[in-house]
Amino acid sequence: MTNQSTIDKLIEMHMTSMADAFRNQMQDISMKEIPFEDRFGMIVDIEYTSRKNSRLKRLIKNAEFEQPDATIAAVDYGHNRKINRHLIERLATCEYITEYRNIFITGATGSGKTYLACAFGMEACKRYYSVKYVRVPDLLLDLQEARDEGRFKDALKKYTNPTLLLLDEWLLMRVTEKDSANLLELIHKRRKHSSTIFCSQYLEEDWYQKLGGKDNPLTDAIMDRISFDSYKIPIMSLDPEKDISMREVYGLDPSQAQ
């Protein structure tokens, strides 16, 4: 078997990085002095790394992050904000995902909620978890349209399948009974096998009324499923008169999420 035949077969098996590495070794005279086992290990490492990198790129692309450049390392803990750095660094390990626990990120507009959520999502991608970002207004519209058209189960899978779901603008507006039913279906199916990050301008104690309060029989069911064992990250202002939008701090377009 010729070397070119080996290269062609590697390419046919979609092992292009391994094929390139093998070709480079054949052209490098110094490689002849290295034992076969070591050379083969080097080639396998190159293919392995290439596949891992490709998988990571796909996960990040499929997540559809609002802020794809967000990182935990770049999270700003200053600028007149009170934020739990120790908890954030702990959650960056993604242990909460293995525990199937949720995260609540609350704070005013421009406080950096979306950035932090996307940073958590990026850490999850780096550990090869599937992630999905979505604005709740878009989510509710998508689910209700799907229900009206008889394709609700298929639409729901987009949001139940990811290991980590980022729900931005959570309860920005009061939801309808139909919205509540769709949310309950989503939250129930994700419970005990995945994690969700909720980003909201409102404190958790206000969510009950935003969901309809006592007038909505589904309110208790929703809150019970998302609140238990959830991690809370309130982003608070130390002095409202000195507030600065985190969009400016992170160099983001003013039209981007909170």
Residue locations for each model-derived region?
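Interdomain "pre-motor" coupling segment immediately N-terminal to P-loop NTPase/helicase cores
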Residues: 11, 16-67
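Short glycine-rich substrate-engagement loop in P-loop NTPases that contacts/grips substrate
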Residues: 80-89, 131-160
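Phosphate-binding P-loop
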Residues: 92-100
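Walker A/P-loop nucleotide-binding motif
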Residues: 100-116
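Loop/turn-to-beta-strand initiation segments
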Residues: 101, 128-130, 161-164, 191-198
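Post-Walker A helix-loop "phosphate-sensing" segment adjacent to the P-loop in P-loop NTPases
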Residues: 121-134
